[in-house]
């Protein structure tokens, strides 16, 4: 019954429950973040690296080599 819910804290230590809850939430948050980082769509760290590499490779292929005095 609702009026007797306070008796639960006579059985369980409130500090232990709060520390356990905080530890579980921290582990859960890390797990969710690492799962998201492992996906292609939701990885916010490597965003745009493939596009930047492709652009750099295309620009390197288009850019002509400098003409030196020995080549003339």
Swiss-Prot record:
Keywords: Antenna complex, Bacteriochlorophyll, Cell inner membrane, Cell membrane, Chlorophyll, Chromophore, Light-harvesting polypeptide, Magnesium, Membrane, Metal-binding, Transmembrane, Transmembrane helix. Residues 38-72 are periplasmic. It comes from Rhodocyclus tenuis. The chain crosses the membrane at residues 17-37. NCBIfam families: pufA_517_ASD (NF040861). It is a single-pass type II membrane protein. It comes from the Bacteria. Gene3D superfamilies: Light-harvesting complex. Residues 1-16 are cytoplasmic. One of its GO terms (molecular function) is metal ion binding. PROSITE patterns: ANTENNA_COMP_ALPHA. This is Light-harvesting polypeptide B-885 alpha-1 chain. Pfam families: LHC. InterPro entries: Antenna_a/b, Antenna_alpha, Antenna_alpha_CS, Light-harvesting_complex. The core complex is formed by different alpha and beta chains, binding bacteriochlorophyll molecules, and arranged most probably in tetrameric structures disposed around the reaction center. The non-pigmented gamma chains may constitute additional components. Antenna complexes are light-harvesting systems, which transfer the excitation energy to the reaction centers. A bacteriochlorophyll binds at residue 33.
């Amino acid at each position: 019954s609702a009026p007797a819910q306070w008796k639960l804290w006579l059985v369980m230590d409130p500090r232990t429950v709060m520390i356990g809850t905080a530890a579980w939430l921290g582990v859960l948050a890390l797990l969710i973040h690492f799962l998201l980082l492992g996906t292609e769509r939701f990885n916010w760290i490597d965003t745009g690296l493939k596009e930047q590499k492709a652009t750099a490779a295309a620009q390197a292929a288009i850019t002509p080599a400098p003409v030196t005095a020995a080549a003339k």
